Each structure stands twice: as structure tokens, then as C-alpha cells.
Amino acid sequence: MDDYIKTIGLSTYEKIKKDIIFGVLPPLKKLKLKELTKTYNASISTLREILSRLAGDGFVLSQEQKGFCVSPVSKTDLYEIANLRILIESHALKKSIENSNTEWEAELLSAHYKLKVYENNMLNEKFNNKNDWKENDSEFHQTLVKNCRSENLVKLHKLIFDKYLRYQFLVLTFRGENSILEHQKLLDFTLEKNYLKAQKVLEEHIYRGLDNTVLDSDTY
């Protein structure tokens, strides 16, 4: 029974976090427990525990005597998150390349293929589901680092990546051929085990996405 409760709690945690990342729950939105029980079909005690955990992860603010609200956004926070992502993802990618094996390379090729299909379809205006596109983008970047052989590093990268992704969903513009080319170069240099070139492309990719996010936003 305890395991079942934990599973329900984890599932609800992921649903609420996803809604914050995707902008369904926008910055500074009040999170009223009674309303959330209907939306997420969870008890008040479970929701309170989940919101406290999300506060610890930086997605929610816990306000004394005022309850919970979605964390605010700012350019300062965005730049800090972007720099942290570069630091963490670069290190994890280096370790993944050092531990390179056939199974990981196959997963990487598969993740990139799915992302490339989505991006090419968007480029040719055959597809415009940006949520699915960013989920495939996330899968590719998570696969890049998963072979680092450090569970803590993978979890830390996922947390920072999700925070960065939240900002992208506030504007969510597609950079077209530039994004496609950067992902291809990142794949190629990684498979060639050329960390220095892969790291350079990764850093440029993140900073260009950052500039795009800042320029297109009037939210923060």
C-alpha cells in the first residue's frame, strides 16, 4: 500500500511539474489545494507534500501564511540556469564520451533521428506540435549525458534542463535550420568522440537558444 501511495504521489508530482514547464500553470499562479485536488485527483495531504518538493526543486514558491504559487521568472534567473546547464551538460557529455559503447551510440542515433524528423517537418510546415518537438529535443539531450555513469549527475542535469525548458516554453520559437545543423554537429562530434568540438557546439547551441528566448520574450 505504501508503494502504491508513493507511485501515485510521484505521478502527480510529474504531472504538476510538466504543467509548470509547459506553461499550463504560468509564473506566479496561486496553487490552491482544493482546486488542485480536482485537477490532479489527489488528496490535499499528497498535494501539500508534492508542492513542498516542487518548492525545494525551484518550480514553486512556498509563501508563509499565503500557501503556494508557481515560481516567478526573470532574465537573471534564465542566464544563471543557462550557464549551469552548460557547465553540467558539458561535464556529463565528456564522461559519456569517455564511457562510449555501442548501446549508447545506438540510443543516441535513435533519439537524434526522432528529433530530426520533428524538426524537418516543422521546417517544412508539415507539423506544428511544439510540445512534442521539445520533448524529443529533451530526449536527445538527456541521451547525450545518460552514459556518464553517474545517477546524481543525470538527475542534476534533468533538473536544470527542465528549468531551462520552462523558459523556452514561455516563447517557444523554432530556430529552423540553425537548430537542425547544431543538433547534427553535436551528434557527429559525439560519435567521433571529439569532446572539444562537441562541447563547443553544445555551448553555442545553448547560448543561441538563450538569445532567441530573451529576444522573443515580453514575459520577463
Predicted feature residues:
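C-terminal effector-binding regulatory domain of bacterial HTH transcription factors
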Residues: 1-2, 196-220
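A short, hydrophobic/aromatic-rich structural module that often spans a beta strand
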Residues: 21, 25-26, 160-174
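Conserved amphipathic alpha-helical segments that form helical-bundle/coiled-coil interaction surfaces
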Residues: 102-169, 181-188, 197-208
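Short helix-capping and inter-helix turn/linker motifs at the boundaries of alpha-helical repeat units
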Residues: 7, 176-177
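Short, flexible turn/loop "capping" segments at secondary-structure junctions
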Residues: 61-63, 137, 178-180
